Amino acid sequence: MSSLDRKKPQNRSKNNYYNICLKEKGSEELTCEEHARIIFDGLYEFVGLLDAHGNVLEVNQVALEGGGITLEEIRGKPFWKARWWQISKKTEATQKRLVETASSGEFVRCDVEILGKSGGREVIAVDFSLLPICNEEGSIVYLLAEGRNITDKKKAEAMLALKNQELEQSVECIRKLDNAKSDFFAKVSHELRTPLSLILGPLEAVMAAEAGRESPYWKQFEVIQRNAMTLLKQVNTLLDLAKMDARQMGLSYRRANLSQLTRTISSNFEGIAQQKSITFDTKLPVQMVAEVDCEKYERIILNLLSNAFKFTPDGGLIRCCLSLSRPNYALVTVSDSGPGIPPALRKEIFERFHQLSQEGQQATRGTGLGLSIVKEFVELHRGTISVSDAPGGGALFQVKLPLNAPEGAYVASNTAPRRDNPQVVDTDEYLLLAPNAENEAEVLPFQSDQPRVLIVEDNPDMRGFIKDCLSSDYQVYVAPDGAKALELMSNMPPDLLITDLIMPVMSGDMLVHQVRKKNELSHIPIMVLSAKSDAELRVKLLSESVQDFLLKPFSAHELRARVSNLVSMKVAGDALRKELSDQGDDIAILTHRLIKSRHRLQQSNIALSASEARWKAVYENSAAGIVLTDPENRILNANPAFQRITGYGEKDLEGLSMEQLTPSDESPQIKQRLANLLQGGGAEYSVERSYLCKNGSTIWANASVSLMPQRVGESPVILQIIDDITEKKQAQENLNQLQQQLVYVSRSATMGEFAAYIAHEINQPLSAIMTNANAGTRWLGNEPSNIPEAKEALARIIRDSDRAAEIIRMVRSFLKRQETVLKPIDLKALVTDTSLILKAPSQNNSVNLDVVADDELPEIWGDGVQIQQLIINLAMNAIEAISQADCETRQLTLSFSGNDTGDALVISVKDTGPGISERQMAQLFNAFYTTKKEGLGMGLAICLTITEVHNGKIWVECPPAGGACFLVSIPARQGSGT
């Protein structure tokens, strides 16, 4: 026989092997071989030793069990003939080829599949290697076969590959959808421009033919033209976005004077600046020539200036400057004295469809594309745009553009047949302002008895349109937002309120809420206008607070008809209220109920559809299992989540009873709870219980069970909501195990601190035993022997040996690692053992220890060792506190008693130490909190854990006389338990 001495390989080349030395075995080597065999069989992965020809010499136990093989079956036989490789002839041939390669001196490593699990009945993937091992002469004598189970890794890799493929498909789908969206925008924009051209062209011809502003239709023509231009701008913007998304947006470079371009664009805003009393300051050089796309440069300046004018309050300041920045760059800055832009939003404002709203400012209507377009156009020019705080407050936008076009780009000369100077633009198109609309909210004294209608709408043109539709039949006054409307209503209540939903300062739904809160206004009928087609919002408003809901766009005829109905009902209600005022009837309530009932009837189908859609969405997409059962607990319906949790398909659950999914030991309690629920003896209940899955496994869940609302005569339906908490339970179990380990480690550490005291306690009886043994020997050695004295010496030896044995028994019991087992605790023995353990440390620290216990103590169930550990931890803390504080009175009192009702054991650990501050008390039981220079701060946290395991409580009190008193309450328990 010989043993193997491994040496580290000297060469990590292709021929990678170990050198070995052969020695004769002695007894020491045999022992080492036995140890090696134990380690070899204890290895978790596949390990085998082959001779140079690939015949099996040794294989570890794990590999043998995985393949369902015994070593005697394969020892001395070719490795590739073993059961592991009998998946197919190809697998066997591959393994034979690998062995031949390794036998030639080459290290082999690859991933293979073998029959390596469930006794050779299951295929697993293995990271397999063959390492040639040579002797001192360089001859190959062994092949070391090693394998690591990578089945889970392979599955994960396959799943990852599948997910990556799905992700690639999703990305491709998104790309196609994005292209389709851009194509759709482009086509729709082109299609819309044709009818818009046919609106604007004839309109301009009609306006040119009319007799100027004296024409009775001039105002309507202006409204049509202004809104058609606004729509055309939005269509052009969408078309630009589609081109940019399709990377079809190019630049038409031209040598131009940026100063002249900027000056001309800025001049279009001077009228608006004067109208709003805004100081508009421009600082431009005489000339700055650059190669830019003039049209896109104009759009950049227009959008930045319109943005500044939107947010700058009346009397504010706006600056537009142009200057050189670094070599070959133009810097455009636009600053305002508005509310500014918070740093957190400075990236978002350049995103598409993002609108920044500022409370108290004029409405910022629009598409939210202005700054996005600016950023896109700037980046097309290879420039940059940024926003920061303006000096003195407000926003400061800075645009940097290169003065020269990229090398190779075509640049048109300033004499090319395009306009040399930018055209004058209509700034209303960019600011979305209607002229002369500032004083619309002013209310003139009403001169007639016509019903009053208040219109609340932030769009001036829409306000004017509604006012024109109704002014012939009603006294109409208007407000631009909810706050102004509320102020007007308080002074002059209308007979009808017509309000838009989305407005600045105060929205329409907030206005409705405020109106309904005021008793003097609560009877006013309300009509809501909205461009948002939201069925759920519509149902909510109609059912709770408003009388009508009208979607934009609407016809003048429909508006008049609806207004007439609501005003007629209001006038009739007022007349009835006046007629019946002496009878004390509240006709307003009756009228409100009548209107409310009518609208409930009208909207019932819509509400039902919305409710069913919400329920279906919750039912099908909820992560919790939802099951409907009949009174016999047979399954009527189960949602996909429940099917996924239990592994049953929809067809599997047809006719199945929930009892069949319930473990037999839980079935009686489940039946009783359901019976109580059906008989009215119990309300809705929740319980933690287990379920049997289709594959035979068990899951844990929180089950909430209740009765569904039912009509008279209908059979009851039970709703069960199941929340899978299997992983949570496993995590809790792992946490409990960790807590048990922590408690044991703490117990060991405590006993380590007691080592000196225990040695002292054992040394005393051992010394007495030696003394009495010597004395007994002398008494027996006398002539004649003194038998009585010798017997007394032996009795003392027995007494002292019993004392030493009791101390050792107590230490072994305290250090024993075991699961928490709840059983009756011998409290007298517990008190005695604890007193014995604490005797030495209290004496060594000059602390007077008193242990007081009632004659009759409640019987408690628990883990005696853990309760003892809890008491010792508290007592040692007290001894240490007394010693470090150098107290005059050094007293520690342990007391054991029943509480007032006799249903709990109360343990008190009271000391005369320095006490505990209020700040310390708040963190006292937190893990890792300590007031000591040394220590982990885990002692009291472990005490809390032990108390909670026993369903008890622990708290601390500070007596007026000083010191600290820790109290532990452990409930008494009837019956038996584990």
Curated annotation (Swiss-Prot):
Residues 187-405, 757-974 form the Histidine kinase domain. Transmembrane segments: none annotated. SUPFAM superfamilies: ATPase domain of HSP90 chaperone/DNA topoisomerase II/histidine kinase (SSF55874), CheY-like (SSF52172), Homodimeric domain of signal transducing histidine kinase (SSF47384), PYP-like sensor domain (PAS domain) (SSF55785). GO terms for molecular function: ATP binding; phosphorelay sensor kinase activity. It is found in: Cytoplasm. The modification 4-aspartylphosphate is found at D500. InterPro entries: CheY-like_superfamily (IPR011006), HATPase_C_sf (IPR036890), His_kinase_dom (IPR005467), HisK_dim/P_dom (IPR003661), HisK_dim/P_sf (IPR036097), PAC (IPR001610), PAS (IPR000014), PAS-assoc_C (IPR000700). Keywords: ATP-binding, Cytoplasm, Kinase, Nucleotide-binding, Phosphoprotein, Repeat, Transferase, Two-component regulatory system. The modification Phosphohistidine is found at H190, H760. Residues 32-103, 611-681 form the PAS domain. It catalyses: ATP + protein L-histidine = ADP + protein N-phospho-L-histidine. One of its GO terms (cellular component) is cytoplasm. Autophosphorylated. Activation requires a sequential transfer of a phosphate group from a His in the primary transmitter domain, to an Asp in the receiver domain and to a His in the secondary transmitter domain. Residues 108-162, 685-737 form the PAC domain. The keyword Phosphoprotein applies. Disruption phenotype: Mutants are unable to use toluene as the sole carbon source, are incapable of converting indole to indigo and do not have catechol dioxygenase activity. The keyword Transferase applies. Residues 452-567 form the Response regulatory domain. Homodimer. Binds as a dimer to a pseudopalindromic sequence. Contains a basic region leucine zipper dimerization motif at the N-terminus. Member of the two-component regulatory system TodS/TodT involved in the regulation of toluene degradation. Phosphorylates TodT via a four-step phosphorelay in response to toluene. This is Sensor histidine kinase TodS. It comes from Pseudomonas putida (strain ATCC 700007 / DSM 6899 / JCM 31910 / BCRC 17059 / LMG 24140 / F1).
